[in-house]
Amino acid sequence: MNTSTSAFDFGSSTASSAATSTTSSQPDANDHLSRLAAMTQGVGKEDPETSSTPSTEASLYPGISAAYMQSYGWPQNYNYFGQPLGPATFPGWPQCYPNTAWPNYGELFASSKKGRQTYQRYQTSVLEAKFQQSSYVSKKQREELRLQTQLTDRQIKIWFQNRRMKAKKEKQRVDDHTEHTPLLPANPPKGMGMDMDDEKKWQMAHWPPAAAHNPYQYPLCPP
């Protein structure tokens, strides 16, 4: 009798312990899900109170936190919106692609125009008259031209160099033109030409004959 009673007590205690474990395991599962959700929501944000140390949820679940760290990086790698990001992924970018210094084309154009010398009409006429006499001038002649035109010796040299180049180009153009034009004698002999009477005879012979006048070709107007 005592044996059956003890067996009944053991069965009841086992059932009660199983029920207790079942009821206690359900809150543990819910708590695990809530902690997992809280930990996933914290990824990408930085809490000022816990910015220096990992969160307690991460310490409780090292396996899951390690997976998130491997996939997304630790939260301190992400800053708040509006804050600068971390160092660039390619630190060698400035060395590979330095800033290109574009030239100032305005200054280059101004400098090129600044170096060009302009001559007045009186100066050009004096230099041109001297060039018609001789395309090369000596030092003494350049000194005379300098006193007449108020130009420097270098400016006079440059003008004569440019003038000789211009004359050379003009001569080359004339030579090219004469090579392509047919050469005809200026005064052909009389045997090659025709007199005025012969030319008129030739024209009359090759013109079409004029139609004979027929007074009845057109109808007469009524009186």
UniProtKB/Swiss-Prot annotation:
It is found in: Nucleus. Residues 112-171 bind DNA. SUPFAM superfamilies: Homeodomain-like (SSF46689). Disruption phenotype: Fails to swell on exposure to the rectal pathogen M.nematophilum, a coryneform bacterium. Residues 1-58, 168-191 are annotated as: Disordered. GO terms for molecular function: DNA-binding transcription factor activity, RNA polymerase II-specific; RNA polymerase II cis-regulatory region sequence-specific DNA binding; RNA polymerase II-specific DNA-binding transcription factor binding. Keywords: Developmental protein, DNA-binding, Homeobox, Nucleus. Residues 1-25 have a biased composition (Low complexity). One of its GO terms (biological process) is positive regulation of transcription by RNA polymerase II. GO terms for cellular component: nucleus. Interacts with the TCF transcription factor pop-1. Involved in control of cell fate and pattern formation along the anterior-posterior axis, acting mainly in the tail. Required during embryonic and postembryonic development. Essential for the determination of specific neurons, including the PLM touch neurons. Plays a role in neural fate specification in the hermaphrodite-specific neuron (HSN)/PHB neuron lineage, acting in concert with T-box protein tbx-2 and the asymmetric cell division protein ham-1. Belongs to the Abd-B homeobox family. This is Homeobox protein egl-5. It comes from Caenorhabditis elegans. The lineage of its organism: Eukaryota, Metazoa, Ecdysozoa, Nematoda, Chromadorea.
